[in-house]
C-alpha cells in the first residue's frame, strides 16, 4: 500500500483523498450531522460567558462597499452561503419534476398544495392567539409560515434512515415551495422599498447563463461571474438573495444532450460537484451563524413563553403547520383521486408535516423585519422559533421512526446519497394479484428516458 502510494504523483493522492471526502459529504447523514453540530455549537456559544465573542464574529463586516455588499458575516451566511444550498435544492427539485417522481402534474400538485396549506394555517393560528395583544403583535403573522429546508432535510436524514425516497422528495418540494411563498410574502408585506430595476436586470445574466448551458458551455470562468451577478442583482433589489440560487438551478438542463446515451445530464454533473460544498461548508456555517439565540436562563425562557407573540409562533409551527399540510393533502387526494404516491403513507405525511414546522432561516428573518432588533419582543420571537422548531423536530422523530421497527429495511436511501439510491426507489403500489410495473431511476437515462 505504502509503496503504491509513493509511486503515485502527489496530485493523484490529493485528488483521491479529496474525492473520498466529497463522497462522504454527499451522504445526507453527514451533511445533517454537520448542520446540527453547527447549530448546537452556536446555541452553547451564544449562552456561554463567551457570548460577546459570538456576537462580535457574527457582526464582523466584510465586502466591497462600492457594491453595497459590505455585509456582516451573519448576512453573508444567510444571503450568500445559503444561496448555494438553494441552488442544490433547486437542482434536485427540477430533476424530480422533469425525470423523477413529480413529472406527473397530478402527483406534483399534492406537495405544492400542501405547502400552501402549510403557509396559511400557521398564519391563521398565530392571528387567533395574538388578536387580543394589539396591532403591533399582529405584525409577526408570517413568522411561523416558513420552513427551514436545510434543517428539515438534515433532521430527516438523521431520523429517517429507512424511509422510502418519496418521503424526501415530498418534503423537498413542500419546503422549497413553502419558502418561495414566504419570500414573496417578505417582498410584498415586509419590504419597505423594492427596487424593480435590479430585479428586472437579473434576467440578463440569467438568460446568458441559460444560453451557455444549452450550448453545453461549462467553463467556470464564464458561468460563475454570471451567477454572482445574478445573485448581486437579486440582493440589490431587496428580495431575499437565496431566490437567485433557485432561479439559476431552474435553467440548468435536466436531460443529457443525447437521451439515448448513458452520459449524465448537466444537472446531475452540477449537483454532484456542488453538493459537497453545500453540505460541508455552506449549510454548517449558516447554522453556526444563525442558530445562536441567547435564551437568558430560566427567567428569560419563562418571560418569552408567556408573551402571546411567542405562544403564537410556537403554536403556529407545532400545530398550524401540520394542520395545514395534512388537511390540504387529504383534500387534494380526495378531490383528484391522486393518492399519496410511491410508498407514502399517512404516517409519513404526519411526520413530514411536523418537519415542516422547523422554522429557522426565513422565520428569523421575518422576525427581524416584524420587531425591531434589540427589543424584548424580538428576543422572545427568536426563543419561540428555536423552541417551536425543537418541539416539531422531536415529534417528527417520534412519528417517523415508528413504522420502521416492523417495516422493510431495504430502502436505506435517505441516509445515503439520494442519487445513488434513486435507482432502487420503491415502485408504485398495485392491487393484489397484479404485477408491479418497472420503474427506471432518474439516474439511468440510458435504460428508459423520461418522456
From Swiss-Prot:
The chain crosses the membrane at residues 32-52, 71-91, 109-129, 140-160, 169-189, 193-213, 220-242, 282-302, 312-332, 354-374, 380-400. It is a multi-pass membrane protein. Keywords: Antiport, Cell membrane, Ion transport, Membrane, Sodium, Sodium transport, Transmembrane, Transmembrane helix, Transport. Coiled coil: none annotated. The keyword Membrane applies. InterPro entries: Na/H_antiporter_dom_sf (IPR023171), NhaA (IPR004670). It catalyses: Na(+)(in) + 2 H(+)(out) = Na(+)(out) + 2 H(+)(in). GO terms for molecular function: sodium:proton antiporter activity. Residues 421-433 have a biased composition (Low complexity). It comes from the Bacteria. Residues 407-451 are annotated as: Disordered. The keyword DNA-binding does not apply. GO terms for cellular component: plasma membrane. It is found in: Cell membrane. Residues 437-451 have a biased composition (Polar residues). One of its GO terms (biological process) is regulation of pH. Na(+)/H(+) antiporter that extrudes sodium in exchange for external protons. Belongs to the NhaA Na(+)/H(+) (TC 2.A.33) antiporter family. This is Na(+)/H(+) antiporter NhaA 3. It comes from Salinispora arenicola (strain CNS-205).
Amino acid at each position: 500500500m505504502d509503496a503504491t502510494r509513493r509511486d503515485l504523483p502527489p496530485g493523484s493522492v490529493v485528488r483521491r483523498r479529496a474525492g473520498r471526502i466529497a463522497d462522504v459529504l454527499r451522504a445526507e447523514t453527514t451533511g445533517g450531522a454537520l448542520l446540527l453540530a453547527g447549530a448546537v455549537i452556536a446555541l452553547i456559544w451564544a449562552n456561554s460567558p463567551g457570548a460577546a465573542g459570538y456576537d462580535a464574529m457574527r457582526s464582523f463586516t466584510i465586502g466591497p462597499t462600492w457594491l453595497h455588499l459590505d455585509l456582516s458575516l451573519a448576512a453573508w451566511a444567510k444571503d450568500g452561503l445559503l444561496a448555494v444550498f438553494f441552488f442544490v435544492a433547486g437542482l434536485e427539485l427540477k430533476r424530480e419534476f422533469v425525470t423523477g417522481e413529480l413529472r406527473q402534474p397530478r402527483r406534483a400538485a399534492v406537495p405544492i398544495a400542501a405547502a400552501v396549506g402549510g403557509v396559511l394555517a400557521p398564519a391563521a393560528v398565530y392571528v387567533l392567539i395574538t388578536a387580543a395583544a394589539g396591532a403591533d403583535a399582529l405584525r409577526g403573522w408570517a413568522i411561523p409560515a416558513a420552513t427551514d429546508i436545510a434543517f428539515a432535510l438534515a433532521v430527516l436524514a438523521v431520523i429517517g434512515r429507512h424511509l422510502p425516497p418519496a418521503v424526501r422528495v415530498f418534503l423537498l418540494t413542500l419546503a422549497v415551495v413553502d419558502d418561495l411563498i414566504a419570500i414573496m410574502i417578505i417582498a410584498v408585506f415586509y419590504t419597505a422599498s423594492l427596487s424593480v430595476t435590479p430585479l428586472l436586470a437579473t434576467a440578463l445574466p440569467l438568460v446568458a447563463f441559460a444560453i451557455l448551458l444549452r450550448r453545453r458551455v461549462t467553463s467556470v470562468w464564464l458561468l460563475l461571474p454570471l451567477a454572482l451577478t445574478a445573485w448581486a442583482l437579486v440582493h440589490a433589489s431587496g428580495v431575499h438573495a437565496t431566490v437567485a440560487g433557485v432561479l439559476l438551478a431552474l435553467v440548468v438542463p435536466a436531460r443529457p444532450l443525447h437521451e439515448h446515451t448513458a452520459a449524465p445530464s448537466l444537472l446531475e454533473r452540477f449537483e454532484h460537484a456542488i453538493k459537497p460544498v453545500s453540505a460541508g461548508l455552506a449549510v454548517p456555517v449558516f447554522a453556526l451563524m444563525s442558530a445562536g439565540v441567547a435564551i437568558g436562563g430560566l427567567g428569560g425562557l419563562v418571560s418569552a413563553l408567556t408573551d402571546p407573540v411567542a405562544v403564537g409562533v410556537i403554536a403556529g409551527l407545532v400545530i398550524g403547520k401540520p394542520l395545514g399540510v395534512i388537511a390540504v393533502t387529504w383534500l387534494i387526494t380526495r378531490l383528484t383521486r391522486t393518492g399519496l404516491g410511491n410508498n407514502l403513507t399517512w404516517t409519513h405525511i404526519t411526520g413530514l408535516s411536523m418537519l415542516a414546522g422547523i422554522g429557522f432561516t426565513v422565520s428569523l428573518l421575518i422576525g427581524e423585519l416584524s420587531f425591531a432588533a434589540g427589543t424584548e419582543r424580538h428576543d422572545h420571537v427568536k426563543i419561540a422559533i428555536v423552541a417551536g422548531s425543537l418541539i416539531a423536530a422531536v415529534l417528527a422523530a417520534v412519528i417517523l421512526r415508528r413504522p420502521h421497527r416492523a417495516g422493510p429495511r431495504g430502502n436505506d436511501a435517505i441516509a445515503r446519497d439520494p442519487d445513488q439510491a434513486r435507482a432502487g426507489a420503491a415502485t408504485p403500489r398495485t392491487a393484489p394479484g397484479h404485477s408491479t410495473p418497472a420503474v427506471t431511476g432518474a439516474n439511468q437515462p440510458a435504460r428508459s428516458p423520461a418522456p
